[in-house]
Amino acid sequence: MDIKLIAIDLDGTLLHSDRTLSDENIQAIREAKEAGVQVILCTGRPLLAMNYLLDEIGLRDEGDLAITYNGGLIQKTQTGEVVRQMTLNREECIEVFELGRDLHLPVNFIDLKHIYEPPYPEGAESIYMSDRRKDTTKIDLQFKEVDIDNLPEPFFINKIVMSRPGEELDAMIPKIPAAYHDKFNIYKSQEFILEILPPSVDKGSAMRFIGEALGFEKHQIMGLGDQENDLTLVSEAGLGVAMDNAIPAVKEVADYITKSNNENGVAHAINKFVLKK
């Protein structure tokens, strides 16, 4: 198997549970890149929030790409230039805000620079990026209050999130009308984050787009992940790799189950299938 492209999720996959990056994973990725393999980090985060990882690994050269906002954006890591972008419009944002109000869940609109904060339901403030609010040195996007009745026109958003403790989200998700699932791509990216994206947006479609643009066949692509938002990343790769800590649904579609994120499962898979050592 001649792997030419590796697409790697971050949280729960490349990163340890304490969100650190191991020397083993860094070394494996660097060796793969030196061997001519295109390595792409895939995340729900904005590019600004992963620059330190790209720098540490060495993925900021000309030609390096990243999949951000769970597939809504493909960007050049060296310049931030947008290669492909899928967005939600003003009317769709209002529609999702009304859903949040009905479910008593807070809504945040997120673009390349801002986390917009329309009014939250009483007693249900958003916990999205709450840790970064406490430490302003870690804020990658700027929080900005917005009046839902006076949104700018045009108003294009990369993704919408509803962020509350997991048990609150789990209680409300079954109450989302089917019409919303038909119109949007809705899933939990983390225990406390529900994401709402354009219907055609996911990590797998972004991975496919890059593979086709670079002239790679499906069997030359490896995708690694652990959560619901990684399902297409794993299922649509020629070699789909699930972490040992992955949810059952991801393991079911995987071709191989590697070690856990805390055991450097990414390095293990790259060494086994790409570097052949």
Each model region followed by its residue ranges:
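Residue-level signal for inorganic ion chemistry
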Residues: 32, 43, 70, 160, ...
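Short, acidic loop-to-helix structural element flanking the phosphoryl-transfer center
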Residues: 19-36, 85-92, 145, 198-212, ...
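Conserved acidic, metal-coordinating active-site core of Asp-based
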Residues: 99, 103-224
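Short, structured coil segments at secondary-structure junctions
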Residues: 62, 70, 180-182, 236-237, ...
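Active-site phosphate-binding/coordination module
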Residues: 23-129
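Hydrophobic packing residues within well-ordered alpha-helices of enzyme cores
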Residues: 25, 50-54, 172, 176, ...
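Mg2+-dependent phosphoryl-transfer enzymes with acidic/Ser/Thr/Gly-rich catalytic loops
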Residues: 1-5, 16, 22, 195-277
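Short active-site oxyanion
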Residues: 36-40, 62-64, 159, 219-220, ...
